[in-house]
From Swiss-Prot:
Subunit note: Component of the RNA degradosome, which is a multiprotein complex involved in RNA processing and mRNA degradation.
NCBIfam families the record matches: polynuc_phos (TIGR03591), PRK11824.1 (NF008805)
Taxonomic lineage from the root: Bacteria, Pseudomonadati, Pseudomonadota, Gammaproteobacteria, Pseudomonadales
Cellular component terms (Gene Ontology): cytosol
GO molecular function: 3'-5'-RNA exonuclease activity; magnesium ion binding; polyribonucleotide nucleotidyltransferase activity; RNA binding
Protein task: Involved in mRNA degradation. Catalyzes the phosphorolysis of single-stranded polyribonucleotides processively in the 3'- to 5'-direction.
PANTHER family: POLYRIBONUCLEOTIDE NUCLEOTIDYLTRANSFERASE, POLYRIBONUCLEOTIDE NUCLEOTIDYLTRANSFERASE 1, MITOCHONDRIAL
Organism: Marinobacter nauticus (strain ATCC 700491 / DSM 11845 / VT8) (Marinobacter aquaeolei)
Location (main, coarse): cytoplasm
Name of this chain's protein: Polyribonucleotide nucleotidyltransferase
Domain KH: 572-631
Similarity field: Belongs to the polyribonucleotide nucleotidyltransferase family.
Residues that coordinate or bind Mg(2+): D505, D511
Short name of any one Pfam family annotated for the protein: RNase_PH_C
Length: 722
């Protein structure tokens, strides 16, 4: 029988993991920021932990060295995620773990994507994924600025071709303090401005903001202030990358096929220019499709040296872009024949849907939105479980962009990132003029259905929502309108375009959206695709946008200039009354019997708080008033001299006990039943009989003396509805 060979004792080798963090700190807006790499996520292409106060965000980037075969676009993805453990919480729900991205996570992912995307070189097709994970969260500051800095720093040290870094800053404003950096949540609640600015050391690339009617000069000042203050972050990231960054990858853009470019210009440039003179979008697209097909048929081939179909289409697009941009720079009419400052024709209708609480159809050229406003009770408010704590939002805004709006068949389903982002921008535009929940105790939902789109559907949603809300009777502080601006810049020449088309957005260098009232700006969003946008250009764009906004408001005001005085008959009726806190138990009753009885009797719903505030919800005003009357009856104090309609509860030899309020009886003495002498109470009264009585007295023990004979003919009982 064989034996296993004798095993030799293994030598235990001690492995030591060396974690050597490299750290840099800088100050911005009175806060200390720390950049750290080399300790966490070392297998990522680049990883930086950014800390400030109690906030810590891990930024990682992974990039592919080579593009996927046939890749025709830049596959950049940005994922911002908030872990509930960062705030010392356990996720709610059955599964007790984070699930699909929240709206806040989606919006912040877009916020980070927008300024970094234009800084990758043209033609770069390698996959890049940026992941920002909030690992510790302060209850005072939003972690989005730390996340933007983390993304910038991770890209800066990764070696991936990236023309950054960027910095980011949040700017607040009050009349007393002026502009200030890094506002807390508490400071934002009283600030007239909430603006996030991002950019490089030379240029602003992205602005996202909401304001409470600031002027164009104040908004521009905030942009410049934020850009100036973020320079400390940009300098720190540059120094951090110089000390800790990997060598920049060797990457060269694909050599331009000038022969093909010139061939398309020569053969089809004139036809493309003629096609862009067609005013109708669908007809223009059809003609451009025909020209493109002809170019592919003539120039593409499978033989050696011939360009592929995809290559011909790519260079055809470049010729399209150059044709349109040259026309704009030379001052020629735009694609639809307008000059640079003219707004497309506007058509406004309200009350277009009979069953909804408020509705509007807003059409501007080939962009159209049907917007509805629905009123609900405070039970319908959105409950947001954020890292900084739970809060309630009574104003909901949802934006839908179905594929038919651009003449296409496509995916239908839950909203994508773009729809969520556009909805939030439109909501920012009208939020400043919305009433508070105390002023108007309703939950409000606005829904924008984009039915046609050719540029700036989000700003059409702003206009449409303002109209629909006023149609519903929501007491807006002022009407709001929005406009999208564009820019074409070639060298030192530039043209600012008012009310851009979809093609102008795609082919231009800037997307600049402004919403506001006649008095000032309520929202500003800016995305810039190139370097070199000067203060002068931004100032001109804001001035031009102001003129366009006032024009649109004038057109809207011709149809409806102020909220309707009455709510829709279909809207729920909400009434708020105040009772003494000691009376709450009377309204609730034993085991809730009284309040349930009121609800069953009237069809209303009732909410009470500890301060004695009673909110009554009903489908119509009559049901609400009936419930109000019942609550007032229950909580009313008996008034001497008042007349009540009561019910005889019990008859005794010396009189009758009459119930005049819920749970409150009084005695009508036999001598107070009639002017004439009565021998037997039962000769005049019977149990269950309804009678009018007047209160003569309430003694210090709460005993109530009533009289029937003191009620004069024609007198009516006290009206508790008043």
């Amino acid at each position: 029988m064989g034996h296993w060979p004798e095993s030799k004792p293994l030598k235990m080798q001690e492995f030591i993991v060396e974690l050597q963090p490299r750290i840099k700190t800088f100050e911005m807006g009175g806060e200390t920021f720390t950049l750290e790499t080399g300790r966490i996520a070392r297998q990522a292409t680049g990883a930086v932990l950014v800390s400030t106060g109690d906030t810590a965000v891990l930024g990682t980037v992974v990039g592919a060295k080579e593009p996927k075969p046939g890749q025709g676009f830049f596959p950049l993805t940005v994922n911002y995620q908030e872990k509930t453990y960062a705030a010392g919480k356990i996720p709610g729900g059955f599964f007790k773990r984070e699930g699909r991205p929240s709206e806040k996570e989606t919006l912040t992912s877009r916020l980070i994507d927008r300024p970094i995307r234009p800084l990758f070189p043209n033609g770069y097709m390698n996959e890049v994924q940026v992941v920002l994970t909030v690992m510790s969260a302060s209850k005072n500051h939003d972690p989005d600025i730390a996340a933007m800095i983390a993304a910038s720093a991770a890209l800066a040290i990764s070696g991936i071709p990236f023309d950054g870094p960027i910095g980011a800053a949040r700017v607040g404003y009050t009349n007393e303090k002026g502009y200030f950096l890094n506002p807390t949540f508490e400071e934002l609640s009283t600030s007239l401005l909430d603006m996030v600015v991002a950019g490089t050391d030379e240029a602003v690339l992205m602005v996202e903001s909401e304001a409470k009617g600031l002027t164009e000069d104040q908004m521009l000042g905030a942009v410049l202030f934020g850009h100036q203050e973020m320079q400390t972050a940009i300098t720190a990231i540059k120094e951090f990358a110089a000390e800790n960054g990997k060598p920049r990858w060797e990457w060269q853009p694909e050599a331009e096929n000038t022969e093909l470019l010139n061939a398309i210009k020569a053969e089809f440039g004139g036809a493309i220019e003629e096609a862009y003179a067609i005013r109708d979008k669908m007809a223009r697209y059809e003609r451009l499709g025909e020209i493109k097909s002809a170019a592919v048929e003539k120039l593409a081939g499978e033989e050696e040296g011939q360009p592929s179909e995809e290559e011909v289409k790519k260079y055809f697009g470049k010729v399209e872009k150059s044709v349109v941009r040259l026309q704009v720079i030379e001052g020629k009419p735009r694609i639809d024949g307008r000059d640079n400052k003219t707004v497309r024709p506007i058509k406004v209708e309200v009350g277009v849907l009979p069953s909804v609480h408020g509705s509007a159809l807003f059409t501007r050229g080939e962009t159209q939105a049907i917007v509805t406003a629905t009123l609900g009770t405070t039970r319908d408010v959105q409950i947001i479980d954020a890292l900084e704590g739970e809060r309630k939002d009574p104003f909901l805004f949802h934006y839908n962009f179905p594929p038919y709006s651009v003449g296409e068949a496509g995916r239908m389903g839950s909203p994508g990132r773009r729809e969520i982002g556009h909805g939030r921008l439109a909501k920012r535009g009208v939020a400043a003029v919305m009433p508070t929940i105390e002023e108007f105790p309703y939950a409000i939902r606005a829904v924008s259905e984009i039915t046609e789109s050719n540029g700036s559907s989000s700003m059409a949603s702003v206009c449409g929502s303002s109209l629909a809300l006023m149609d519903a009777g929501v007491p807006l502080k002022a009407p709001v309108a929005g406009i999208a601006m564009g820019l074409v810049k070639e060298g030192d020449k530039f043209a600012v375009l008012t009310d851009i088309l979809g093609d102008e957005d795609h082919l231009g260098d800037m997307d600049f959206k402004v919403a506001g009232t006649k008095e000032g700006v309520t929202a500003l969003q800016m995305d810039i695709k190139i370097q070199g946008i000067t203060d002068e250009i931004m100032e001109i764009a804001l001035e031009q946008a102001n003129a366009a906004r006032l024009h649109i408001l004038d057109e809207m005001n011709k149809v409806i200039a102020e909220p309707r005085a009455e709510l829709s008959d279909r809207a729920p009726s909400i009434t708020t009354i105040k009772i003494h806190p000691d009376k709450i138990r009377d309204v609730i009753g034993k085991g809730g019997a009284t309040i349930r009885g009121i609800c069953d009797e009237t069809g209303a719903s009732i909410d009470l708080d500890d301060d004695g505030n009673v909110k009554i919800y009903a489908d119509n005003a009559a049901a609400a008033q009936a419930a109000v009357n019942r609550v007032k009856e229950i909580t009313a104090e008996i008034e001497v001299g008042a007349i009540y309609k009561g019910r005889v509860e019990r008859i005794v030899d010396f009189g009758a006990f009459v119930n005049i309020l819920p749970g409150k009886d009084g005695l009508v003495h036999i001598s107070q039943i009639s002017e004439r002498r009565i021998e037997n109470v039962t000769d005049e009264l019977s149990e269950g009989q309804e009678v009018l009585v007047k209160v003569l007295d309430v003694d210090n023990r709460g005993r109530v003396k009533l009289s029937m004979k003191e009620v004069k003919e024609g007198e009516q009982p006290t009206d508790f509805a008043d």
